[in-house]
Regions:
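Acidic/histidine-rich catalytic neighborhood of metal-dependent amide-processing enzymes
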Residues: 1-57
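Long, contiguous binding/interaction regions
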Residues: 196-197
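Substrate-recognition/cap regions that form aromatic- and gly/pro-loop-enriched pockets
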Residues: 217-218
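Midchain, well-structured core segments that form catalytic/ion-binding scaffolds
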Residues: 38-183, 187-189, 202-211
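Glycine-rich, small-residue loops and helix-cap segments
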Residues: 214
Length: 218
């Protein structure tokens, strides 16, 4: 209170309880999209960890659902009348895996099949998978999504299916680092607590929606 009174300004607290799940997952992105940080000059985010460190590089996330629509039929009695959505999805899954050493070699793509049909004697007319597409930069992961859309188009032609790609949560950007702020915070934190903050960068493995904030507010 005394600091604010002497320097002026305002402290704003954004609460984000359970912000990682549900349709509004990575909810800080929603805050950014709604312009809640437009008049904020600087932001601090604290996250529990096993050590104290400066802001780290993080990966982007494109959280997408992939759906295939086909035509049901009896798998033994009249398989020729069906269009197997699961076959198309499995082919898509394997295609993504094959590209991990090629065009997607700099990306981290992982996912699960969430719906592959209900009974083995029925050709599934619907199949669904959920993926996280992670990259070093937002441009890189977004370009991967465009490539995946092209792959889906090709699979639809081959299997006579219809596919759909949708985002099931907010997308997550890469972190824009501000070394000057990290240095200032480290000096104040170490002087005040007597603890040491690690200054180096580690290989990015995770993601955070605080990165979305860093694109509009340091």
């Amino acid at each position: 209170g005394n600091i604010i009174e002497s320097l002026g300004g305002e402290v704003v607290v954004f609460g984000t309880p359970a912000e990682e799940g549900g349709d509004n997952g990575s909810a800080k992105a929603s805050f950014v999209n709604e312009g809640l940080f437009d008049n904020i000059d600087a932001a601090l985010m604290f996250h529990p960890a096993n050590k104290n460190s400066v802001t780290q590089k993080t990966q982007t996330v494109e959280p997408v659902d992939i759906e295939f629509f086909g035509k049901t039929a009896h798998a033994a009695g009249s398989p020729e009348k069906g269009i197997n959505a699961l076959h198309a999805l499995i082919h898509f899954y394997n295609t993504l895996h094959s590209h991990q050493t090629g065009k997607f070699k700099n990306l981290n793509i992982h996912g699960v099949i969430t719906d592959g049909g209900k009974a083995p004697n029925v050709i599934p007319d619907y199949a669904k998978a959920r993926f996280y597409i992670r990259g070093a930069t937002s441009n890189e992961s977004r370009e991967a999504v465009n490539t995946i859309k092209d792959i889906l188009t090709g699979i639809d032609k081959a299997f006579n299916t219809t596919s759909k790609l949708t985002y099931f949560q907010n997308r997550v950007d890469h972190f824009v680092l501000t070394p000057e702020f990290d240095k200032l915070f480290s000096n104040i934190y170490e002087d005040y607590t007597g603890l040491t903050i690690e200054k180096g960068q580690i290989k990015p493995g995770g993601s955070t929606d605080a990165a979305n904030v860093s694109h509009v507010t340091p």
